[in-house]
Amino acid sequence: LCVHFRRDRIAGGLVIQIGSDLFCAIGFISKNILLKALIEPYLSAAKEHGILAPMYLELTTGLRRGELLALRWGDLDVQNRTLSINKSVARQDGKLVISTPKTPNSIRTVLLPEDTVKLLVEEHARHPANPYLFPSPRTGETWDPDGFRRLHDRIIKEIGAEHVRFHDMRHTLDLLFGWACGNRVC
């Protein structure tokens, strides 16, 4: 089994460089990821908690938590199946602040799978007047990133997974991409 990653995503095992920034990890021990067998239970639990759409989007895009929670409906282009990532939410001085993403390279357009777009359109029907893709059920505004993380942590515990931080879901995407591509560079 050979899965291709950027070097910063590999935590151990035999590593072979195959390009300037791509490496093949064989028999590696990755950073914490959500195992493939736990993805369905994770998504089922997310659905029970009312957050299937953001968690599904996370698994198909690997967005940072702040990027995910700052998304607005205007960022989604249904026809072209793209999502514009151009802002992030974070807590500063006790208040939620929406600003530009972590780095200039973080401003990007992401192509979405058709099933992800369909799920997002269904999510929009649940709260059509709200500008946020995933509004907080408490406030109707953007989710507090810490509260969203705590809900993710609760779901991880419910499904019996070893601790997988929300940020680790980005690494899960790398592995899913490797499985979907038949363990080759796609």
Predicted feature locations:
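Active-site/catalytic core of tyrosine-dependent DNA strand-transfer enzymes
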Residues: 80, 88-91, 113-162
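N-terminal DNA-binding recognition helix of tyrosine site-specific recombinases/integrases
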Residues: 1-13, 19, 64-66
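N-terminal core-binding DNA-recognition domain of tyrosine site-specific recombinases/integrases
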Residues: 1, 9-11, 28, 140-147, ...
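Generic structural detector for well-ordered beta-strands
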Residues: 84, 109-111
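Short, flexible, glycine-rich and Lys/Arg-enriched loop motifs at helix boundaries
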Residues: 87-105
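Basic, Lys/Arg- and aromatic-enriched nucleic-acid-binding interface segment
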Residues: 22-73, 78-79, 90, 106-107, ...
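C-terminal catalytic core of tyrosine-transesterase DNA break-rejoin enzymes
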Residues: 56, 60-67, 147, 151-156, ...
